[in-house]
């Protein structure tokens, strides 16, 4: 999978501040996704490993005693129309593959608006042969999710 991220969101994931990825729709299975960072970066420059998918509606019930958490969850649901939060188990920084490189070497490449599946594509082959892992990795544990951690970034 290739997921699209704004540069500010990418930086929050890279720094370890952001521990959940919120989306309107998302598969209910662990995902390894390459990260495409939008303008001004315009490049694939990381890998994110997403674990368990949480329904925000379930969190509303679970955290109902914490009014601040309920307010944040409702905002994510009503303002941004998010339905799910995926645990960011791990982030791996990589070298960059620029948009120009992708357009030049992968016929018909268009930067994703949200996400695209890569299984069996030329794009996946190009990414796998050109992306190099760096030393930077960030890992998170989700043994206990506190109310103060939900819907904050």
Residues covered by each model-derived region:
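Short polar/acidic secondary-structure junctions
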Residues: 38-40
């Amino acid at each position: 999978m290739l997921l699209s991220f704004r540069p500010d969101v990418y930086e929050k994931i890279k720094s370890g501040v952001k521990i959940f990825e919120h989306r309107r729709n998302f598969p209910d299975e662990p995902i390894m996704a390459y990260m495409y960072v939008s303008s001004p970066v315009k490049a694939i420059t990381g890998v994110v490993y997403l674990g368990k998918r949480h329904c925000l509606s379930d969190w509303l019930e679970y955290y109902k005693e914490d009014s601040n958490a309920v307010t944040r969850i409702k905002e994510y649901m009503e303002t941004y129309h998010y339905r799910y939060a995926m645990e960011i188990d791990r982030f791996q920084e990589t070298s960059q593959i620029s948009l120009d490189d992708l357009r030049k070497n992968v016929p018909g490449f268009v930067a994703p608006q949200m996400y695209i599946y890569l299984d069996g594509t030329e794009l996946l082959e190009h990414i796998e042969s050109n992306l190099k892992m760096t030393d930077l990795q960030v890992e998170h544990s989700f043994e206990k999710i506190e109310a103060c951690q939900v819907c904050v970034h």
